[in-house]
Amino acid sequence: MDAVTVYHGKISRETGEKLLLATGLDGSYLLRDSESVPGVYCLCVLYQGYIYTYRVSQTETGSWSAETAPGVHKRFFRKVKNLISAFQKPDQGIVTPLQYPVEKSSGRGPQAPTGRRDSDICLNAP
């Protein structure tokens, strides 16, 4: 799980919510340990000022799944990264597609698209 850049480990629900609200971007998301269920993770997503939380767990056979909206067929994935990729598409049973990862390692929130690429930025050396 540590290889997943949006995994924040054992942070509180409140800390996760603060990180997401600080972005101000619908579709911002992170993954954290569940505070109430050992061995289960929470996929937290910001949408219209609210944080939506979906439980993510691993089966005994190693597959990953997320609890989504009632009536949505439960899907299983070999890796957490595959689960996240699937939920980046619309109509997957969560409130909004995952768009802006809030990564632990960078210490920064997601960056909104600016229309510029890194290659468009030039630095002038003295």
Swiss-Prot record:
Location in or out of the cell: Cytoplasm
Protein's GO biological process: adaptive immune response; cell-cell signaling; cellular defense response; humoral immune response; natural killer cell activation; natural killer cell mediated cytotoxicity; negative regulation of T cell receptor signaling pathway; positive regulation of natural killer cell mediated cytotoxicity
Region (Disordered): 100-126
Region of interest (Interaction with FYN SH3 domain), residue spans: 67-92
A GO CC annotation given for this chain: cytoplasm
Record bears the keyword Acetylation: yes
CDD domains tied to this protein: SH2_SAP1a (cd10400)
N6-acetyllysine carried by residues: K89
Tissue specificity as recorded in UniProt: T-cells.
GO molecular function: protein-macromolecule adaptor activity
Residue ranges of every copy of the SH2 domain listed in the record: 6-104
Oligomeric form and interacting partners: Interacts with CD84, CD244, LY9, SLAMF1 and FYN. Interacts with NTRK1, NTRK2 and NTRK3.
Listed PANTHER family: INOSITOL POLYPHOSPHATE-RELATED PHOSPHATASE DOMAIN-CONTAINING PROTEIN, SH2 DOMAIN-CONTAINING PROTEIN
Role summary: Cytoplasmic adapter regulating receptors of the signaling lymphocytic activation molecule (SLAM) family such as SLAMF1, CD244, LY9, CD84, SLAMF6 and SLAMF7. In SLAM signaling seems to cooperate with SH2D1B/EAT-2. Initially it has been proposed that association with SLAMF1 prevents SLAMF1 binding to inhibitory effectors including INPP5D/SHIP1 and PTPN11/SHP-2. However, by simultaneous interactions, recruits FYN which subsequently phosphorylates and activates SLAMF1. Positively regulates CD244/2B4- and CD84-mediated natural killer (NK) cell functions.
Protein name: SH2 domain-containing protein 1A
